[in-house]
Every structure is written in structure tokens, then in C-alpha cells.
Amino acid sequence: MAALLWGAPLTAQAQCRLALVLALDVSASVDAEEYDLQRLGLAAALDAPDVRDAILRGQNGSVALAVFEWSGRFQQDLHLDWTLLQSHADIDRAVLALGNISRSFEGYPTSVGQALGYAASLLKRGPACDRRVIDMSGDGINNYGYGPAEAYRHFPLRDVQVNGLVILGDDAEVEAFYRREVIRGPGAFVELSAGFEGFRAAMTRKLFREINDMMLGHADAPRLSPHG
């Protein structure tokens, strides 16, 4: 699928506080129903009022977003190229695009290291922002190709925060794998989803936290409303 670029154009003058890459697992363990829950859950999370408010409320620049799907060694597909989210209309277009994407790959293994490498390449050519974050979502451990450790050695990820959204299911080791090998950087965290059914709520929590990360811990930090 061709990458989509909407929203405000990325210019050298545009002030950006956060460059956020969302990496979605579409490996063989994700069936068609689970894929739809993930796809629609992401769109709904980005559309959540609290997340919208967090994106648009920032006083120190905009949020830039890129989204890709990943699976095996050579299976990475960009669905939303770098887009500045500076208005509700920008967010509306991104939500519409993400809600209507088609699955890129089926039946391939789980290559977390390669996905991190691809995310690093996106950040390298992306906007210059105050913070750079990769949001890795997955339901399994690395089972093909090089792992996260090799990716961190060979790609320019030194100043990048990598967080994880773990989809709990049949693989009992996936949470420990993400905590031990995937997340990286000061303040990095793992968000848990109770199966794919919980993906929407987990992604909403995760986006809200990542976008507000510079304020968390302060007395006046924003809080996610009970309904997201």
C-alpha cells in the first residue's frame, strides 16, 4: 500500500515536540478478526477525546506521526508517512486512513529486530523533534532474524525511547521479552492489552502517556478520563 501523507507539511521551520512511530504486528499469530480489532482499535484510540486533546494542547510544538505494519525479515509496510497533527482536521484524516488500511502480510514470522531497524530508518528521515518515540505492538517474541539487541547495536537508536504494547494471549513469555529486550530509554514502559479485545483501551492509555510524557509526574499533569 502506498504511504499516505496528510496534515500539515513537514518543514524545517515547523516546531515539533514529539516524533512518534507506531509499529503494528501482523505476523502469523494474528488472525483476521484480531487484525481488525487492532486496526480499528488504533483508529479509535487516536480519535479518543483525551488523546486528541493531548496532541493539540501542547505548547512546545506539534506531534508528528508515522505508522507501519511489520512481520518477518523483509515484511514492513508504511501505511501513514510522517504527518504533523496540528488540528482536528489533521487527526480526522489520520483516523480515517488508519481505519481503512488493508493488511500488508499474512503467514510470516515475528522479526522484532528488523521492525526496530525499519522504525529507525523512519526516524532518521523524519522531522527534527524534541523527543523521538517508537511504539512497538506485538503478541509474540522474536522468532526469525536478528533480535532487538542487534538492532540497538547497529541502528541509530541511542536517543530514542522505545515502548511496548504487549497483547497477552497464548505466548506466556511475551511480556517478559518486551520488558527485558524491547523497551529502551529513560521512562520506557510496557502497556498490557488483555488480548486483542483490549487493544483499543490499551492503545488509548499508551498514546495518552507517550504524548504527555514530559508532564507526567507533575502535580498538574493531565489525567486520562474514565472513558478515554
Positions of PLM-derived features:
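Second-shell loop/turn segments in exported
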Residues: 23-33, 65, 81-84, 98-109, ...
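Short beta-strand-loop
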Residues: 58-98, 174-181
